[in-house]
Amino acid sequence: MSEATGRVVLITGGSRGIGLATAQRFAALGDRVAVTYNSSPPPEGFFAVKCDVTSSADVDDAFKAVEQHYGPVEILVSNAGMTKDMLLLRMSEDDFTEVIDANLTAAYRVAKRAAQGMLKAR
């Protein structure tokens, strides 16, 4: 990775696991890091926004909060996701749809919103 540039970084699902480790790395490089979370708030030291990435309104509100706090998002890490720990034969269509919405559709949703801000800042 290059030297720190103070870039604005948004990491969805940044309160734990891989998302938190990624947030910590960007912060160590001197970047301004914002994280979204749904159920578990991140540790102190990050600008955190509660956001259900399956909701377009929540995603838009989260981006607005980050943009007000830091400015336009320059780097997006779409990390939020979920799983239903069950066998396929036990999984209902609603369960499957919920997983797809959180893991696939949400990535589209946040990437589209990030691109809008990135193009404006260009």
PLM features: what roles do these ranges have?
Residues 15-16:
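Conserved glycine-rich cofactor-binding loop
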Residues 111-112:
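A short, exposed helix-loop element centered on a Lys and neighboring polar residues
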